[in-house]
């Protein structure tokens, strides 16, 4: 795990949990609060309030992170974590150092106003695996002006961006 937390109780709790579970991490402590998300359920449908100006908006490209990426078998990154310029540049730089045969999984997170087509395309060119849920799939279909079946749209992304795999997860209505 590569990220940033605040020098606060939540940040300490996160680092302690990673350590307890023997998860290798490069977590930088920064002078911003640890990020939180408030989730409200209205008739079973979640709405998110994603707090801004938090630690994970300030991830730095350390030499240790680049060294780790160069040896990685897999890297997972998302679009939400790239909402700030600093973290976007860091995540994209670190991801670019992964070996060509490593899995570079883009777990797209299309939340509120924290994405645009440019960010998605930049991330797709770094990825070789794309994971989306059914709601995100429909947003991507509209954003890229695509028609066709789920399979046809998935194949378009695979061909256009040179993906190894396109993973579409279904919500509870499709289980």
Predicted regions: what is each one?
Residues 49, 82-89, 140-144:
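Glycine/threonine-rich flexible loop motifs
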